Amino acid sequence: MYGTYEEIAGKPAVRFERRYRHPVDRVWRAVTEPEQLAQWFPNTVEVDLREGGHMRFEFPGGEMEPMEGAVTELDPPRRFAFTWGDEHLQIELEPDGDGCRLRFTHVLSTREQAARDAAGWHVCLDRLEALLAGDAGEAPGTEATSEWSEHYEAYQRRGVPAGAPIPGGG
């Protein structure tokens, strides 16, 4: 279930594919509704859920300045794409037997952030799975530091580019 590093149109990206045992509509709500996003996404998110709609991302504890973004593509309940600062994220869902398949792509600003961000998304997507299963625990970033560190090291061993600063000095 590890993500992969690739280049998309010459830009660095990390990509994940996960299968969840929940219908597309249920997963769609978890990836588009701010109350549910707050349970697994690394920021609280305000979103005007329409193409061109404004997005605002606030970091827990005010550790970083809020970021702005916009919805770039919206095809409910199949595709949700948006900018996050100068980066681009895309979430695609498709039915798969008794559940659905999620494809998550994050086009990055720099190669060096790939291992760091892949580890973070790995934790977040695990958290999404827990949320879908009914575990309303804390959002990523609170108790996930050791889990993130393990994944970060694993991504580096897999040859995913690294070297970007680690928030909090981790």
Each language-model region and where it sits:
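Glycine-rich portal/gate segments that line the openings of hydrophobic small-molecule binding cavities
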Residues: 39-83, 165-170
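Residue-level signal for tight coil/turn positions that link beta-strands
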Residues: 11, 22, 52, 75-77, ...
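Intrinsic-disorder/low-complexity, polar/charged segments enriched in Ser/Thr/Lys/Arg/Asp/Glu/Gln
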Residues: 13-17, 54, 66, 79, ...
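Hydrophobic ligand-binding cavity/cleft-lining segments
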Residues: 1-44, 167-170
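Residues at helix-coil transition
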Residues: 32-33, 42, 76, 126, ...
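A conserved amphipathic terminal alpha-helix motif
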Residues: 108-169
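Beta-strand/loop substructures that line and gate deep hydrophobic ligand-binding cavities in soluble
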Residues: 72, 79-132
